[in-house]
Amino acid sequence: MRAAWRTLVAGQIDAERLVFVDEMGSNTSLAPLHAWAPCGERARCSVPRNRGKNTTLLASMTAEGMGPCMAVVGSTSAVVFETYVERVLAPVLRAGQVVVLDNLGAHKGERVRELIEGRGCELLFLPPYSPDLNPIEEAFSKVKALLRRAGARTREALIEAMGRALDVVATRDSRGFFEHCGYQLPAQPI
């Protein structure tokens, strides 16, 4: 399936038409994984014991950068995902784009397909267990590192930090993530 995916995308679809959509969970107990301390002393930081409910970020990404996003308390359900597609993603889709989703059950609703195809776009699903083919996963890794550094301890601060972290993912980053996942993009003028 993975080889078929690479053949399909490499041979038939312009990578600049791809729109990857996924979700990332986070909470208020994120802390840096590495720290500096004076020689001979242990680096320390405080982390709340009660993480509270997860905050889920639903977002899209193209080769040009991060697209529209939505944060919700709790996890992604079919209703939450349909709401994201209908109110946030679909209004900015352009005819001819190809929306790529992973195989989460919430992504497979008929309403999701109708909303995407109704905008003149195509819907594709990644092969199972293939986060390495999804460049938004690499963007989320960068976002999570920035969230750890931010150390937000309230839900409101976490959502604000998510917005700031998403703004840091530049076009150059997105293009690099696409290329690292094997998608060929035309060279950009310097």
Describe the residue ranges of each PLM region.
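Short functional hotspots at interaction and active-site rims
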Residues: M1-I190
